[in-house]
Amino acid sequence: MLVFSVDWCAAWCAVLNADSAFAEAAATWEGAIVVVADGDGAARTGARLDLHRGVCRGARPAVPADERTARYVLTAPPAVWKEVMEGRLTPLMGVMLGKIRLAKGGLMDLLPYVGAAKLMVELAGRVPATFPADWP
């Protein structure tokens, strides 16, 4: 499945919902998060996850309007998201190193969910995926 495709997003949501550790870590999370891959000469793409108290209520490819309405928006070049999904970089380290930009939402608001964010990307790595041809 192509990363951030309809099928991949649905599979990511299903994997999140099947994981009790994620449910516990995200028990107080309310609101959508959008992850956007942009730069490196690749087409802008991303995913929107609707998270509510440890449950993924839906996930789909992101559209531009999602970046305005989501509680949190994280952007990074495709090569960085690839590192994250392959487990070579945590989202928090990516933000701290300036590789991932918190385009919307406050870092202090996200800090209680570091464990949930780490599990989100770890679980994303369990979804069979291929990366777009224009990703480095």
Go through each PLM region and give its residues.
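Feature captures hydrophobic
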Residues: 1-136
